[in-house]
Amino acid sequence: MSENKQALQVAALKNGTVIDHIPSEKLFTVVSLLGLEHMTTNITIGFNLDSKKLGKKGIIKIADKFFCDEEINRISVVAPHVKLNIIRDYEVVEKKEVRMPDELKAIVKCANPKCITNNEPMATLFHVIDKDNCVIKCHYCEKEQKREDITII
């Protein structure tokens, strides 16, 4: 391990996944969306770290965990420009950018109080209409919602 890696604000990771460029105010929402509180491996969370792009950012380092695209893309609703680094033996072997999926299942609450998903025990399902601006439409009642109106379940 080189000298400069020891000077990082958050310790280097031998193997696992680094989720970087998380807006600080969304960090704990991302933790919840990924279910990290249920994991047994080492997890390092950096909050309000200095960032040239964001001013302040969050970072999550998860030891020995490699997420599938479907797991990671869930966070695109709250943090659309997050970067993933896959680490093996202290080296970045792959970089990924979070992409919004075509559908969001059981992640978002429908804003329509009359929607069946708010009145029956069933999972929500939304179709993504506009990935750039995060506009989604409920599969059941067809109500559209924008990012600022979205409530995460």
Swiss-Prot record:
GO molecular function, one term: metal ion binding
Binding site for Zn(2+): 110, 115, 138, 141
GO CC, one annotated term: aspartate carbamoyltransferase complex
Origin: domain of life: Bacteria
Co-factor requirement: Zn(2+)
Record has Chloroplast as a keyword: no
Pfam families reported in the protein's UniProt record: PyrI, PyrI_C
Cofactor note as given: Binds 1 zinc ion per subunit.
SUPFAM superfamilies attached to this UniProt entry: Aspartate carbamoyltransferase, Regulatory-chain, C-terminal domain, Aspartate carbamoyltransferase, Regulatory-chain, N-terminal domain
InterPro entries on file: Asp_carbamoyltransf_reg_N (IPR020545), Asp_carbamoylTrfase_reg (IPR002801), Asp_carbamoyltrfase_reg_C (IPR020542), Asp_carbatrfase_reg_C_sf (IPR036792), Asp_carbatrfase_reg_N_sf (IPR036793)
Keywords attached to this entry: Metal-binding, Pyrimidine biosynthesis, Zinc
Any one GO biological process: 'de novo' pyrimidine nucleobase biosynthetic process
SUBUNIT field: Contains catalytic and regulatory chains.
Family that this chain belongs to: Belongs to the PyrI family.
UniProt function note: Involved in allosteric regulation of aspartate carbamoyltransferase.
Protein name, UniProt field: Aspartate carbamoyltransferase regulatory chain
Native species: Bacteroides fragilis (strain ATCC 25285 / DSM 2151 / CCUG 4856 / JCM 11019 / LMG 10263 / NCTC 9343 / Onslow / VPI 2553 / EN-2)
